Amino acid sequence: MKKLWLALAGMVLAFSASAADFSDGKQYATLDKPVPQSPQVLEFFSFYCPHCYQFAQVYHIPDAIQKALPADAKLTKYHVDFLGELGKELTQAWAVAIALGVEDKVSPLMFDAVQKTQTVKQPQDIRQVFVAAGVKAEDYDSALNSFVVKSLVAQQEKAAADLQLRGVPAVFVNGKYMIKSDGLDTSSMDNYVKQYADVVKFLLSQK
């Protein structure tokens, strides 16, 4: 657990910072080429990524971010297709989850199936995870190749390309800033999670 924590945090020296101390190049980076049409707060992840598992399932950073956001803001999550044998299929499946509004039900089960039990070996196994999450098999099947899902897949791929994504987990704000996890307070897990959410909230307020 300690090794995973250090890896996620970037293995940097601990320090504390208030919002006034947040600065470009430390806790966040300003993109050279902003993407104005990007969702307000956008997280990229992969069900194959061990750090993404820790990010979401152990430290619950996405939950902390969502709770810190103003009422009119939302955290959007996109899956990437460049990791793992079934990366493209899982990106398509995540589009199904978005279309059906079952992201929160599917995410923990899919992370466990891919990384813990390692029971996702073929596309049919992905379908079974959705069924275990309470989605009717016929609903999954009809959504899988729908226009809406195809559009969502293209949307995820385009966002990753436009933002020149290099790795996951990654969080972008207003298509202009990227959170730098190696510049956050690592004195404790709680401080790290809180500051991650605070930086996102701070960046949302920037013009």
Swiss-Prot record:
It is found in: Periplasm. It comes from Dickeya dadantii (strain 3937) (Erwinia chrysanthemi (strain 3937)). Pfam families: DSBA (PF01323). The gene is dsbA. GO terms for molecular function: disulfide oxidoreductase activity. GO terms for cellular component: periplasmic space. PROSITE patterns: THIOREDOXIN_1, THIOREDOXIN_2. Disulfide bonds join C49-C52. InterPro entries: DSBA-like_thioredoxin_dom (IPR001853), DsbA/DsbL (IPR023205), Thiol_disulfide_DsbA (IPR050824), Thioredoxin-like_sf (IPR036249), Thioredoxin_CS (IPR017937), Thioredoxin_domain (IPR013766). It comes from the Bacteria. Belongs to the thioredoxin family. DsbA subfamily. Coiled coil: none annotated. Residues 20-149 form the Thioredoxin domain. This is Thiol:disulfide interchange protein DsbA. PANTHER family: THIOL:DISULFIDE INTERCHANGE PROTEIN DSBA. The keyword Disulfide bond applies. Required for disulfide bond formation in some periplasmic proteins such as PhoA or OmpA. Acts by transferring its disulfide bond to other proteins and is reduced in the process. DsbA is reoxidized by DsbB. It is required for pilus biogenesis.
